[in-house]
């Protein structure tokens, strides 16, 4: 079992039951999945850029990403329907817990000029999204071997009913929100 999963079972669930007076353990919010998305607009010019992004996302997540394809043509972006425009990976189960542990303990503290994550990034249903500007903050990425710095979006999907429940869930894991 993952260290963070055991922490969730032993500490987070009892604390949230006490705070929100849930009648059942099954009513306690939990993290359902973590989605990592890398949008690469330059991939229409050079196909190698997409391969490098897939390689980076594979190293970061430990899972092979799928290529996202444009749903419709947009002339101003020079995109046609069916063009590859990025890649994404969805983490569930043990990989989800391992990645979340790595995100909290290693990756977020390595962000330059970090002052805490915004509390406004919840979507109204307790899901949290954050953007990372450079992939080199992940320990799996070798700084000397990257072709360019790319960012990514990370979405933490929970089954909580409100932003308050989602925020309390992430706060129990010591997620670094702004004061």
From Swiss-Prot:
Keywords: Ribonucleoprotein, Ribosomal protein, RNA-binding, rRNA-binding, tRNA-binding. The keyword rRNA-binding applies. It holds the Pfam family Ribosomal_L5_C. One of its GO terms (molecular function) is rRNA binding. One of its GO terms (cellular component) is ribosome. This is one of the proteins that bind and probably mediate the attachment of the 5S RNA into the large ribosomal subunit, where it forms part of the central protuberance. In the 70S ribosome it contacts protein S13 of the 30S subunit (bridge B1b), connecting the 2 subunits; this bridge is implicated in subunit movement. Contacts the P site tRNA; the 5S rRNA and some of its associated proteins might help stabilize positioning of ribosome-bound tRNAs. Part of the 50S ribosomal subunit; part of the 5S rRNA/L5/L18/L25 subcomplex. Contacts the 5S rRNA and the P site tRNA. Forms a bridge to the 30S subunit in the 70S ribosome. Belongs to the universal ribosomal protein uL5 family. This is Large ribosomal subunit protein uL5. The lineage of its organism: Bacteria, Pseudomonadati, Pseudomonadota, Gammaproteobacteria, Enterobacterales.
């Amino acid at each position: 079992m993952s260290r963070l999963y055991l922490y969730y079972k032993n500490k987070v669930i009892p604390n949230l039951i006490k705070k929100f007076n849930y009648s059942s353990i099954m009513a306690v919010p939990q993290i359902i999945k973590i989605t990592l998305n890398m949008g690469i607009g330059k991939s229409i010019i050079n196909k190698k850029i997409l391969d490098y992004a897939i390689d980076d996302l594979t190293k970061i997540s430990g899972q092979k990403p799928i290529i996202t394809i444009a749903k419709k043509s947009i002339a101003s972006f020079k995109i046609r329907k069916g063009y590859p425009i990025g890649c994404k990976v969805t983490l569930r189960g043990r990989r989800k817990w391992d990645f979340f542990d790595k995100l909290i303990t290693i990756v977020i503290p390595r962000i330059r000029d970090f002052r805490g994550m915004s509390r406004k990034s919840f979507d109204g249903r307790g899901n949290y999204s954050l953007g990372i500007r450079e992939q080199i903050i992940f320990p799996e990425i070798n700084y000397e071997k990257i072709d360019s710095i790319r960012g990514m979006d990370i979405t933490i999907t929970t089954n909580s009913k409100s932003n308050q429940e989602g925020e309390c869930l992430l706060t129990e894991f010591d997620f670094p929100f702004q004061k």
